[in-house]
């Protein structure tokens, strides 16, 4: 077999660490010609069963025999053989057919009958948690910001708000690109639609706090444009955007963004909740909005885990571990940047442990084994977890307004209707 052919196969498969999609075969400079059915079959097997590639071995040795590769010629002109394209399209359709929630056969325009009860219940829970930015009073926060916080306090809060202000927009970009139009079941469409609306509220809340607290124009603009101006936040945003634009499967993207909302967000939530441990009870508006948003995000991660459980073809544990390791490395860099100084009861070492604890919890919810096996280092977060997972708002003045969402049979007519 010629070295040119080996180079071609390594170019295709050597650049992919875990899975191979047929689109990646199109995105190379070399072209396949005279492709045998056996060759296409081998490609399909590689795609349908994600393979962890040993970088020390030639990819061609792992997947193809020399005899099979000898059936491949390299040409420099378009188009590919239509026969190859047919095999690729047929394979993609076969994968979708194996996932009912992605199949057009599952599409319906009416809400009822409900077929996926857990997804529907999640949607209803999201509705019960509905809140608006106008409910949050920031008057005391402004005084606390100016008079009761240290420079270190303000520094880490600004980092967290800067990340969150951009992150909710990134999450919505993923919902538009990879979720709401890809999943064909009505229950998920409802749940993703409500999530999209609440992510907008989150972004509005964080942006409002930045403009309210930070009066220096240059600093405020830097924070608002953090995905361009702050390296540790840019790295997080780049990782998210990599998955938005990736040609990996729905399962990959579902796992990746469950990590974004379940791991990237958790450390920042914990750092804000730490303020609640302060004796002076500073920044009440920031804290209560953080509670509202943490509740929402808990439901969003729950939705991702429910959707993942509905897939017939889930990722290998080693693949999920690799994705979560990448995310934790990026998150630890953000933590070190946000918390360069040790605060009372809060530092980068403890936060790193907390991130791994949260990652383990997410792995279990996705159906995998724990990887890090560490304890929750923050006692105060155990109490917060109870609040976040509860089905009521203890501090909302209008909590009663959503009390009848579950009571679908209760209909009241006005006397003069």
From Swiss-Prot:
Q: Which GO terms describe its molecular function?
A: metal ion binding; ribonucleoside-diphosphate reductase activity, thioredoxin disulfide as acceptor
- Which PANTHER family does the entry link to? RIBONUCLEOSIDE-DIPHOSPHATE REDUCTASE SMALL CHAIN, RIBONUCLEOSIDE-DIPHOSPHATE REDUCTASE SUBUNIT M2
Which UniProt key words apply to this protein? Answer: Deoxyribonucleotide synthesis, Iron, Metal-binding, Oxidoreductase
Please state the Enzyme Commission number of this protein: 1.17.4.1
Matches recorded under Pfam families: Ribonuc_red_sm (PF00268)
Task: Name the GO terms of the biological process aspect.
Answer: deoxyribonucleotide biosynthetic process
Broadest EC class assigned to this enzyme:
oxidoreductase
The record's remark on the cofactor is: Binds 2 iron ions per subunit.
Keyword presence, Iron: yes
The UniProt function text for this chain reads: Ribonucleoside-diphosphate reductase holoenzyme provides the precursors necessary for viral DNA synthesis. Allows virus growth in non-dividing cells. Catalyzes the biosynthesis of deoxyribonucleotides from the corresponding ribonucleotides.
Protein species of origin:
Acanthamoeba polyphaga mimivirus
Highest taxon of the lineage: Viruses
- Protein name from the UniProt record: Ribonucleoside-diphosphate reductase small chain
Q: Entry's SUPFAM superfamilies?
A: Ferritin-like
Catalytic residue list: 206
């Amino acid at each position: 077999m010629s070295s040119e052919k080996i180079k071609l196969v390594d170019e295709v498969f050597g650049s992919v660490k875990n899975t191979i999609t047929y689109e990646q075969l199109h995105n190379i400079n070399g072209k396949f010609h005279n492709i045998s059915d056996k060759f296409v079959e081998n490609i399909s097997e590689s795609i349908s069963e994600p393979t962890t590639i040993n970088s020390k071995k030639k990819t061609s040795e792992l997947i193809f025999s020399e005899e099979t590769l000898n059936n491949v010629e390299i040409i420099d002109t378009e188009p590919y053989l239509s026969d190859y394209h047919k095999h690729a399209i047929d394979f993609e359709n076969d994968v979708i057919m194996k996932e009912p929630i992605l199949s057009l056969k599952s599409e319906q325009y009416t809400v009822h009958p409900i077929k996926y009860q857990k997804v529907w219940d999640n949607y209803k829970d999201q509705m019960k948690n509905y809140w608006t930015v106008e409910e949050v009073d920031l008057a005391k926060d402004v005084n606390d910001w100016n008079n009761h916080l240290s420079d270190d306090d303000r520094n880490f809060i600004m980092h967290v708000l800067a990340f969150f202000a951009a992150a909710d927009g990134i999450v919505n970009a993923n919902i538009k690109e990879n979720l709401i139009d890809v999943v064909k079941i009505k229950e998920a469409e409802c749940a993703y639609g409500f999530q999209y609306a609440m992510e907008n509220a989150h972004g509005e809340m964080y942006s409002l706090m930045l403009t309210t607290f930070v009066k220096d124009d240059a600093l405020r603009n830097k924070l608002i444009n953090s995905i361009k101006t702050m390296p540790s936040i840019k790295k997080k945003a780049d990782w998210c955007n990599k998955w938005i634009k990736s040609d990996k499967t729905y399962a990959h993207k579902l796992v990746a963004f469950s990590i974004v909302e379940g791991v990237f967000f958790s450390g920042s939530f914990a750092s804000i909740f730490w303020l609640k441990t302060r004796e002076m009870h500073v920044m009440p508006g920031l804290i209560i909005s953080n509670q509202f948003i943490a509740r929402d995000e808990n439901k969003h991660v729950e939705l991702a885990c429910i959707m993942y459980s509905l897939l017939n073809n889930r990722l290998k544990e080693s693949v999920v571990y690799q994705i979560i390791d990448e995310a934790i490395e990026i998150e630890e860099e953000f933590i070190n940047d946000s918390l360069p100084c040790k605060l009372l009861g809060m530092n980068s070492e403890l936060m790193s442990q907390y991130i791994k604890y949260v990652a383990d919890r997410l792995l279990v919810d996705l159906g995998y084994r724990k990887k890090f096996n560490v304890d929750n280092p923050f006692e105060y977060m155990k109490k917060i977890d109870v609040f976040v997972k509860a089905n009521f708002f203890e501090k909302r003045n209008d909590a009663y307004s959503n009390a009848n969402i579950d009571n679908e049979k209760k209909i009241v007519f006005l006397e003069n209707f």
